[in-house]
């Protein structure tokens, strides 16, 4: 005999299983995308580009313009203070 509590428990278990399966599927997709990105960096390095510099540029492009400009200004200030310009 199923009680309301048993049905609620079954629904909760099914919902939990669904969440976990979605997370696992997304983790697989994330790994595949990371592998694809790694392949692109390998390809660009093979074409003579500096992968470290490209990674830096990719990171800079993710930033908002004003944040990037602020960071660059602070770095330039510190470089000037250390006589690096």
From Swiss-Prot:
A molecular function (GO) term: DNA binding
InterPro entries: GapR-like (IPR018753), GapR-like_DNA-bd (IPR046367)
Source superkingdom: Bacteria
HAMAP family: UPF0335 (MF_00797)
Family assignment from sequence similarity: Belongs to the UPF0335 family.
Designated name of the protein: UPF0335 protein BARBAKC583_0130
Naturally occurring in which organism (per UniProt): Bartonella bacilliformis (strain ATCC 35685 / KC583 / Herrer 020/F12,63)
């Amino acid at each position: 005999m199923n009680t309301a509590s048993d049905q609620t428990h079954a629904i909760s278990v099914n919902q939990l299983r669904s969440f976990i399966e979605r997370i696992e599927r997304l983790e697989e997709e994330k790994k595949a995308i990371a592998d694809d990105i790694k392949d692109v960096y390998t390809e660009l390095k093979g074409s003579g580009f500096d992968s470290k510099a490209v990674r830096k540029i990719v990171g800079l492009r993710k930033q908002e313009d004003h944040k990037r400009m602020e960071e660059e200004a602070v770095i330039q200030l510190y470089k000037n203070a250390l006589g690096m310009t």
